[in-house]
């Protein structure tokens, strides 16, 4: 099975889609090749919509098997598509690009260090997870500096031992460093993964793919 793809030639596939368990949210302009790759690689149902009229779904949506946290600027029509499959929480802060500022699985969420504590608590209660404020190697947009499933977490290669230890404590699963698309530490921009499988941007090297497989347990 092919493990790399593009979004209309762009290897930053994580910017244009959000995978949450058995669903993937993608924009209407997603090419058929991209749709097929996600279906086959991740075994997900596709929810097709823009968010606040934009195709950058990965930056504007975060979530897990219980719910989706979405930019507060999403329209009622867009939210209706999501609500058929998940409960939805609107992030109405200045920092409303949910996919950029939240990394989550079914156990934990790591959020931007400047996200207000009360909002972080609300996200935790909504997703049913423990929440920590975190940077990863100096990067504050945790949703792009890391990717989590229920089996593993991959983070920016500059993440410190202390940051990794905090993630291991809150998640209880393996945490490893890696890159995507020939050296990008912003792994969330080029990686879509769930407990079933993964897809990476087509600029990703064989070594980088091997690291993804190792961290998420696909080599077992």
Curated annotation (Swiss-Prot):
One of its GO terms (biological process) is cytosolic ribosome assembly. SMART domains: eIF6. InterPro entries: eIF6. Transmembrane segments: none annotated. The keyword Protein biosynthesis applies. One of its GO terms (molecular function) is translation initiation factor activity. SUPFAM superfamilies: Pentein. The keyword Transmembrane helix does not apply. Binds to the 50S ribosomal subunit and prevents its association with the 30S ribosomal subunit to form the 70S initiation complex. Belongs to the eIF-6 family. HAMAP family: eIF_6. This is Translation initiation factor 6. The lineage of its organism: Archaea, Methanobacteriati, Methanobacteriota, Stenosarchaea group, Methanomicrobia. The gene is eif6.
